[in-house]
C-alpha cells in the first residue's frame, strides 16, 4: 500500500495552532465607519459586530454631539468637537416631529418643512466643515492606514472624506433623494416604469402618473441642489479643482442597498450594487421577563406592537387620545413605544414603554399586528416575521414604503393627519381578522427568506472583498468617464446624421446633375429634329 509523508502528531497540532493564531491577523483589516445617526446607525451596528467577530478593527467617527452613537465593545469610538451643543442639536434635528401631526395650509407647511430641512442641513454641513478642517484628526486618520471606509452616502461629508484620504469606500444605504443613487452608480433609470422617490407611484403607471414621475424630480432639483451644493464646494476647495456631487459619489467601490425586490419594484442594477434588505432582522434575541409577562397575560388574543420610530418622541394630545381610544377597543394587548405625556383615556390593554425590542416582539407567534410609521427597518422586520401592518407614514420615503406594502396586500395605510379613532380601530380589526393580510405578508416573508446568502453575511463579504482587493475597479462602469453627450451617444448620432445628410445631399446633387444633363441632351436632340423637319 502506498504511503504518503507522515507528519508527527505533535508537529501537526503545533502547526494547526500556529495557523489558527496567525490567520485572523493575516486577514484582519481596519475599517473607518462614518455613520448617519438614528435608525440608519442601528443596522450598520450589526455589520460592525460581525466584522469584529471576524477579526477586523472598526473605528467609528462621529461628532461628540449625537443621538444614539455610543461606545461599544466591538468598535472604537472617535469623536470630534463641533460648535453645536446637545440642546441645539436636539432642537434642530429632533424638535420638528410635531410638524408631522399638524394640519395647516399646504404652502405654510411646505415653508416650515423647508426651514426644518435647512436647519438640519446646516447642522450636518457645519459638522462636516469642522471635521475636514480638523488638521490633527485628518493627519491621524491618514496615518492609521484604513483599508476601507463604510458610510451612508446620505452623509455626503463621509464620501468627501473617503475621496480625500484615497480610501476605497463601501456605501451602506436605503436610497438617496433626487436620484443621486442612480446618478452615482450610472444606473439606467427610465421614468416610464421606475417610480421616483416620494411620488408614491407604482411600477405600473397611468399616463398622468408618468407625467408626475417625470416632472417631480425636476421640481425637486432646485431643493436638492441647495442642500448638496455646499458639499461639492467643500470638495472643490479640498481638491483644488471643480468637483460635483456625482464625482464624489462615483468614488464608491460597492453600494450596499438596504432593499430587495420583495419590497421594491424590479429595476435595472449595476455590477457594484448589492441588495441586503432585511439585514436588521439578523439577530433575534430572547425576550426579557418583562415582555414575556406582557405576552403571557394577553391570553389567546395576543399582542399588537406599536412604534413610530426613533425620531418621534411625542404626539399632540388630541391625536394621542384618539389613538388611545382606538387601541382600547380591540381585545389584544398593545405595547406602545411612547415617551410623551400619557393620554388620559389610555385603556387597561395598552402598555406604554420607553423602549421595546421591536424585531424580537414581531418574531413572537402571539404578535397579531404592527402599527408602524413604515420606515424601511420596521417594514423589513414585519416582512421577516410575517406580521401584517397598519401604517401611518410621516415623512420621506415612508409614504412610498406604505404604498408598496398596501399594494401587495400586506397592510392598511392611514393618513395620520386625517384619521379618526374609528379609522384606526377598523384598520386594526381588518389586518387582525382578515386572513388575507396574514397570508400576503407570509408569502412576502417566504420570498424574502428564500435566498442563498443571508443579508448580513453578504454585506460583510463585500466589505472584506473591498479590503482584500483595495477596491473594486473592475465593477466600475466606464459610463463614469463619459461626458453627458457621449453617454447618450449624441456625438455618434450627430456624426451619423451628418453622414446621412451628406450622402443624401451628394446623391441629390448627382441626381440633379444627371437629370439636367439628360434633360439638356434630350432638349438639344428635339431642337435638332425640329430644325431638320423645317
Swiss-Prot record:
Protein's UniProt keywords contain Transferase: yes
Glycan attachment residues as annotated in the record: 119, 142, 296, 348
Q: What is its main location?
A: endoplasmic reticulum
Annotated GO molecular function terms are:
enzyme binding; enzyme inhibitor activity; glucuronosyltransferase activity; protein heterodimerization activity; protein homodimerization activity; retinoic acid binding
Q: Which residues cross the membrane?
A: 492-508
Keyword Glycoprotein in annotation: yes
Q: Which GO terms describe its cellular component?
A: endoplasmic reticulum; endoplasmic reticulum membrane
How would you classify this enzyme at the top EC level? transferase
What reactions does this protein catalyze? glucuronate acceptor + UDP-alpha-D-glucuronate = acceptor beta-D-glucuronoside + UDP + H(+); 17beta-estradiol + UDP-alpha-D-glucuronate = 17beta-estradiol 3-O-(beta-D-glucuronate) + UDP + H(+); 17beta-estradiol + UDP-alpha-D-glucuronate = 17beta-estradiol 17-O-(beta-D-glucuronate) + UDP + H(+); 17alpha-estradiol + UDP-alpha-D-glucuronate = 17alpha-estradiol 3-O-(beta-D-glucuronate) + UDP + H(+)
* Subcellular location field: Endoplasmic reticulum membrane
Recorded topology in the membrane: Single-pass membrane protein
Which first-to-last residue range defines the signal peptide?
1-28
EC numbers listed for it are: 2.4.1.17
Q: Which GO terms describe its biological process?
A: bile acid secretion; estrogen metabolic process; flavonoid metabolic process; negative regulation of fatty acid metabolic process; retinoic acid metabolic process; vitamin D3 metabolic process; xenobiotic metabolic process
**Sorted UniProt keywords:** Endoplasmic reticulum, Glycoprotein, Glycosyltransferase, Lipid metabolism, Membrane, Signal, Transferase, Transmembrane, Transmembrane helix
- Of which family is this protein a member? Belongs to the UDP-glycosyltransferase family.
Assembly: Homodimer. Homooligomer. Interacts with UGT1A1, UGT1A4, UGT1A6, UGT1A7, UGT1A8, UGT1A9 and UGT1A10 to form heterodimers. Isoform 1 interacts with isoform 2/i2 suggesting that oligomerization is involved in negative regulation of transferase activity by isoform 2. Isoform 1 also interacts with respective i2 isoforms of UGT1A1, UGT1A4, UGT1A6, UGT1A7, UGT1A8, UGT1A9 and UGT1A10.
Any further remark recorded for this protein: UGT1A3 isoform is part of the UGT1A complex locus which displays alternative use of promoters, first exons and terminal exons. The locus is defined by 13 first exons, which are alternatively spliced to 3 other common exons and 2 alternative terminal exons 5. From the 27 possible mRNA isoforms, 9 produce functionally active polypeptides (UGT1A1, 1A3, 1A4, 1A5, 1A6, 1A7, 1A8, 1A9 and 1A10) called isoforms 1 (i1). Use of an alternative exon 5 (5b) as terminal exon is leading to 9 additional alternatively spliced products termed isoforms i2 and which lack transferase activity.
**What is this protein identified as?**
UDP-glucuronosyltransferase 1A3
Species: Homo sapiens
This protein's encoding gene: UGT1A3
Amino acid at each position: 500500500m502506498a504511503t504518503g509523508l507522515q507528519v508527527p502528531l505533535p508537529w501537526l497540532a503545533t502547526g494547526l495552532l500556529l495557523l489558527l493564531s496567525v490567520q485572523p491577523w493575516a486577514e484582519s483589516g481596519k475599517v473607518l465607519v462614518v455613520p448617519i445617526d438614528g435608525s440608519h446607525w442601528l443596522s450598520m451596528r450589526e455589520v460592525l459586530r460581525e466584522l469584529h467577530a471576524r477579526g477586523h478593527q472598526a473605528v467609528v467617527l462621529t461628532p461628540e454631539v449625537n443621538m444614539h452613537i455610543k461606545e461599544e465593545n466591538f468598535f472604537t469610538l472617535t469623536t470630534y468637537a463641533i460648535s453645536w451643543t446637545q440642546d441645539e442639536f436636539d432642537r434642530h434635528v429632533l424638535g420638528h416631529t410635531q410638524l408631522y401631526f399638524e394640519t395647516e395650509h399646504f404652502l405654510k407647511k411646505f415653508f416650515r418643512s423647508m426651514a426644518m430641512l435647512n436647519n438640519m442641513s446646516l447642522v450636518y454641513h457645519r459638522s462636516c466643515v469642522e471635521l475636514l478642517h480638523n488638521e490633527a484628526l485628518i493627519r491621524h486618520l491618514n496615518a492609521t492606514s484604513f483599508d476601507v471606509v463604510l458610510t451612508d452616502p446620505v452623509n455626503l461629508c463621509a464620501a468627501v472624506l473617503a475621496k480625500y484620504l484615497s480610501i476605497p469606500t463601501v456605501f451602506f444605504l436605503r436610497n438617496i433623494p433626487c436620484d443621486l443613487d442612480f446618478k452615482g452608480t450610472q444606473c439606467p433609470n427610465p421614468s416610464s416604469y421606475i417610480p421616483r422617490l416620494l411620488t408614491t407611484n407604482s411600477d405600473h403607471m397611468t399616463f398622468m402618473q408618468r407625467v408626475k414621475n417625470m416632472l417631480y424630480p425636476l421640481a425637486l432639483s432646485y431643493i436638492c441642489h441647495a442642500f448638496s451644493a455646499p458639499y461639492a464646494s467643500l470638495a472643490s476647495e479640498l481638491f483644488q479643482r471643480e468637483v460635483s456631487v456625482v464625482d464624489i459619489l462615483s468614488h464608491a467601490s460597492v453600494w450596499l442597498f438596504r432593499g430587495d425586490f420583495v419590497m421594491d419594484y424590479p429595476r435595472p442594477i449595476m455590477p457594484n450594487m448589492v441588495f441586503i434588505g432585511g439585514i436588521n432582522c439578523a439577530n433575534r434575541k430572547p425576550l426579557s421577563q418583562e415582555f414575556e409577562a406582557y405576552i403571557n397575560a394577553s391570553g389567546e388574543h395576543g399582542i399588537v406592537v406599536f412604534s413610530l420610530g426613533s425620531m418621534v418622541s411625542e404626539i399632540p394630545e388630541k391625536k394621542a387620545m384618539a389613538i388611545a381610544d382606538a387601541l382600547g377597543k380591540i381585545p389584544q394587548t398593545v405595547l406602545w413605544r411612547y415617551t410623551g405625556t400619557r393620554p388620559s383615556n389610555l385603556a387597561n390593554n395598552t402598555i406604554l414603554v420607553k423602549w421595546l425590542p421591536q424585531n424580537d416582539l414581531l418574531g413572537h407567534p402571539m404578535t397579531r399586528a404592527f402599527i408602524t410609521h413604515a420606515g424601511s427597518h420596521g417594514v423589513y422586520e414585519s416582512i421577516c416575521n410575517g406580521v401584517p401592518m397598519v401604517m401611518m407614514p410621516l415623512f420621506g420615503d415612508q409614504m412610498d414604503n406604505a404604498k408598496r406594502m398596501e399594494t401587495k396586500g400586506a397592510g392598511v395605510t392611514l393618513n395620520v393627519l386625517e384619521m379618526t379613532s374609528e379609522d384606526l380601530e377598523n384598520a386594526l380589526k381588518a389586518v387582525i381578522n382578515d386572513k388575507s393580510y396574514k397570508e400576503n405578508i407570509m408569502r412576502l416573508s417566504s420570498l424574502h427568506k428564500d435566498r442563498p446568502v443571508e443579508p448580513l453575511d453578504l454585506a460583510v463579504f463585500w466589505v472584506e472583498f473591498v479590503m482584500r482587493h483595495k477596491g473594486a475597479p473592475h465593477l466600475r462602469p466606464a459610463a463614469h468617464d463619459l461626458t453627458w453627450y457621449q453617454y447618450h451617444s449624441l456625438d455618434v448620432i450627430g456624426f451619423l446624421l451628418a453622414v446621412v445628410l451628406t450622402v443624401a445631399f451628394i446623391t441629390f446633387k448627382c441626381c440633379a446633375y444627371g437629370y439636367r444633363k439628360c434633360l439638356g441632351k434630350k432638349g438639344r436632340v428635339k431642337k435638332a429634329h425640329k430644325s431638320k423637319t423645317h
